Amino acid sequence: MAKKTPLERYRNIGIMAHIDAGKTTTSERILFYTGVSHKLGEVHDGAATMDWMEQEQERGITITSAATTCFWRGMAGNYPEHRINVIDTPGHVDFTIEVERSLRVLDGACTVFCAVGGVQPQTETVWRQANKYGVPRLAFVNKMDRSGANFMRVREQMISRLKTNPVPIQLPIGAEDGFAGVIDLVKMKAIYWDDASQGTKFEEREIPASMQADAAIWREKMVESAAEASEELMNKYLETGDLSIEDIKQGLRVRTINNEIVPMLCGTAFKNKGVQAMLDAVLDYLPSPLDIPAIKGTNENGVEDEREPSEDKPFSALAFKIATDPYVGQLIFFRVYSGTIKSGDTVFNPVKGKKERIGRLLQMHANQREEIKEVGTGDIAAAVGLKEVTTGDTLCDLDHIITLERMDFPEPVIHVAVEPKTKIDQEKMGIALNRLAQEDPSFRVRTDEESGQTIISGMGELHLEIIVDRMKREFGVEANVGAPQVAYREAIRKQVEIEGKFVKQSGGRGQYGHVWLRMEPNEAGKGFEFLDEIKGGVVPREYIPAVEKGLQDSLANGVLAGYPVVDVKVALFDGSYHDVDSNENAFKMAASIAFKDGMRKANPVLLEPMMAVEVETPSDFMGNVVGDLSSRRGIIQGMDDIPGFKVIRAEVPLAEMFGYSTILRSATQGRATYSMEFKHYSEAPKNVAEAIINKK
C-alpha cells in the first residue's frame, strides 16, 4: 500500500502542560484549523472535542490522552499536506502516568505555558519526563491576553527552572488587553489574525516602528542560534552577517531535533491567535518518524536489536494505552515503529509470549472513529480484539521477534478501602476494578489479608475519586469509600549479617534450609537488589531463586507497622543444605526468617511521601498561607512574585495535606489555588513514626 502521506510529512506530537495552561483549548484549535472540527469546543462550557469522558467535561480537566489524526498545509496553504497525530495529555499531577505513556510514543511535543503562571510544578515534571525520553519540544506561551501576561518572564523561568535553552522565533505585539498579534522573527513581518473568521484568515504587515529595534535584537539571537547547527551555516553567517529563511529554518530544525534548543512562540488559543503559526512551527521544527533514531529492543535470545522506521522492515509496535470504549469494547492504542499490519493479521506479544489476532483497526479523532484496513510505520491507531495486551507491551511480527523497551510506572502514594453498597455489586466491582487497573498501570487493586477489604491505590485523591466515579458511570457499581490512607514505606539504616534456619527433621522426609544474609541500605529509589555471593556450592544453584523469592515475599510487610520495605540490598553469602531434606520451600522459609530478623536489627525506619506543593495566593494572605504550611511540617523552598500574587513553593508530607483545599479556600477567601505532586520518600520524624506504629 502506497502511503497517502510520505513518512517525512508525518508528525507524531503531544500537547503537554500544567493544568489550566490552556492545553485542551490549544488542542481544540488545532482540530478546528486543520478542518476536522467545525464548531470550536470550549472547555468552559464542557463541550471540548478532545475531552471525551463525562468526568473530564464536568471537571474541565483532561484525563485520558485522546489520539487524533489531522492534516495541515500551513496557515497560508504553502506547505505540502502533512499528517499530524496529536496526543492530548493531562496536566493534572494525579495523571502523570498518562503523560509518561504518551511521551514514550511521540516524536515531538508542544509545551503550553501560561503567560501569567509561567513554569509551574507540573511543567517541571512533564519537562523531566520529556528529557527522559529525549523528546524535542516547542514552547507555546498561551494566554497572552490575560492580565499579568509576560512572555520574557516565561523565557527567564524556562532558563532558570527547566535549565533549557529557549529561542524566541516570535515576539508578542502588546500584552494583556493590548495583545494584537505576533512578530514572526524568521520573516521579519507582523502577523494579525482576523477575529471575524475565528482566526482562519490573517494578514502580514510591516513591524510596528516602536518594535523594530527589539525585533532586530531578538532576530539576531535567533539567527546566531540557527548558525550553530553546522559549520556550513556558521561560515555563511560569518561571511554575510545573516542567513536566508530556508537556512534559519534548517538550522533551528537540526538543533531542535537534537534537543539543543526550544523554539518559543506565543498567542492566545482562546482568542484564536497564534495556534495557526504554532502548527506551521510543528512542520518546520519537529521531527518526522524518519528523523529519530531507530527504536531499540531485544530479540528472542536477549540480544540488543533495533527496528528502523521503514515499511519494508518487519512489523513492530508498542501498546501505550488501553481504553474502554462504550461502543466497541476495549481499545488498545499503539504506535507502529516499523512494517505494516492489516486487520485480521496475527501478531506476537513477546512480553506475554502469546499470539493475538488483530480484529478491527480504528483511527481516532477524539471519540469519533474511522475504520481502516491497514496501518504502517509512523501511524498511531487503535485495535479491537486483543485480549491479553497491557500498557507497555510490544506487538511484533511472528517470525521476527523483538521486545521494545518497556515503560517505568511510579508506585502509588495513597490508598483507600472501597466496598460495594450491595451484594449484587460485589462481583461487578471486582470486574470493574480489574478492567480499570488494566487501563491504568499507576492504579492498583489488592485485598487486605487481615480485614478482607478491597484496597485501591493511586497517585492522589483526585485520581481515586475519578476511578470510583468511573465504576459508577461505566460499570453501574455504587461503592462506599473509606478515608484516604498514606502509603508509608519501611527501610533500614545500617548493615547487618544475619542467619536464617528452617529445619524440621523428625523421621521421614524433613525440611532443611539454612542461609546467611548480609542486609544493607540501598540508594534511595533503587528498590530491592539481590546479590548471589555463594562460593563452592554451599547452597546449591537450584535453591538460590527460592531464597530470592522468599526475600521478595517478605518485602510486602515490614517489621515496624507492616508497610512495604524499600531500598534494601541483600546478599546471600553463606549457608548449608541437606542432601535429602533440603527443598525450595525450606530455603524460601529460611530466607524469610532471616529477613524479618535482620530488619529488626538493622535500625528500621518509617518513610513517608513528601509532596512538592505550590500555592498561588494574593499577597495579603501570604503570612496566613506560609504559617499554615509550616504548621503542617512543611519546609518552604522559595517564593516568586507575579503581579498581585505570591507563589509559595514548599515540601510538605502527604499525611498533612488531606482536606487542604477547603482550609486554603477559607484562609484566602477562595482566592488562592494550589497544586501538589509526589516528590520523594523521606524518613518520618520519631514522634510521627511512633504515632503511626501505635495506630497499627
From Swiss-Prot:
Gene3D superfamilies: 3.30.230.10, 3.30.70.240, Elongation Factor G (Translational Gtpase), domain 3, P-loop containing nucleotide triphosphate hydrolases, Translation factors. Belongs to the TRAFAC class translation factor GTPase superfamily. Classic translation factor GTPase family. EF-G/EF-2 subfamily. GTP binds at residues 17-24, 88-92, 142-145. It is found in: Cytoplasm. Catalyzes the GTP-dependent ribosomal translocation step during translation elongation. During this step, the ribosome changes from the pre-translocational (PRE) to the post-translocational (POST) state as the newly formed A-site-bound peptidyl-tRNA and P-site-bound deacylated tRNA move to the P and E sites, respectively. Catalyzes the coordinated movement of the two tRNA molecules, the mRNA and conformational changes in the ribosome. Pfam families: EFG_C, EFG_III, EFG_IV, GTP_EFTU, GTP_EFTU_D2. Residues 8-290 form the tr-type G domain. This is Elongation factor G. One of its GO terms (cellular component) is cytoplasm. GO terms for biological process: ribosome disassembly. Keywords: Cytoplasm, Elongation factor, GTP-binding, Nucleotide-binding, Protein biosynthesis. One of its GO terms (molecular function) is translation elongation factor activity. Its main location: cytoplasm. InterPro entries: EFG_II, EFG_III, EFG_III/V, EFG_IV, EFG_V, EFG_V-like, EFTu-like_2, G_TR_CS.
